[in-house]
Amino acid sequence: MALYTMKELLQDAQEKKYGVGFFNTFNTDMVRAVIRAAEECSSPVIIGTAEVLLKYGSFDMIAPVMLEAARRAKVPVAVHLDHGYSYEVIMQALRWGFGSVMYDGTREKDHADNVRNSAQLARTCHAMGVGLECELGSVGGLADDAGKVDQMAYTDPNDARSFIEQTGADFLAVSIGTQHGVYKATPKLDLNRLAEIHAAVDVPLVLHGGSGLSDDDFRNTIAGGIRKVNVYTDIILAAKAAIHADGEEAYADALLRAQDAMKEATAVKLRLFGSAGRA
């Protein structure tokens, strides 16, 4: 099947009001698990990797794996760069032919710098036919190279409107109470804020920090306008549990068990997001 773009997948989700899962990967087993799940569910899906995950393998190793797997898939698959902080990594994704990239400017000290950099990257991406995701506010929970963890800052609906107008970003990641990684307490999502953001902008909204949310949280956020749902930690935890289930088995068998567990965890999310049966 031809390679799809995230813009194509989210446009359909926007029109039909469902969510498309994005799953971060950093090796072949993860890529295979996600695509197996998507094919099993007859669901569109987005795969990709994040700049912070490149410590587990070089971009030039994982990028061709994702792209080739997407082309061979029996369902629509888009390939996306998640949380690109540096110009160099974003340019690598563009060079490899990713259909979309995320620029995360939330670590910029000045909001104006985030706006300026996002607008510049939007012009570059659009000239190449690539979609750009940006984040406004801060979901929090990610650590930088020095180990400092980002703190959460909610997205302001008025700021969201002006940000999209000034930058031309195609997708907006919003902060409404989620956080990356494992939650230490039950998250409290600000659904009223989400509704206000959804009314303020006309681009697909993205939910980061999806792992650990309840089924109702997912249903409510998708009903409130979320069209792309990012998942990573839940998939990793499924693989970890599978590997630890039998410490005596061979390494290769443990990898297969982990892949099956990730596939099942992914399939659960695809059905929950409402994308199953839409391929």
Q: Can you name each region flagged by the protein language model?
A:
Residues 208-211:
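Glycine-rich beta-strand-to-loop/alpha-helix junction loops that act as flexible
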Residues 243-279:
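Extended, intrinsically disordered, low-complexity segments
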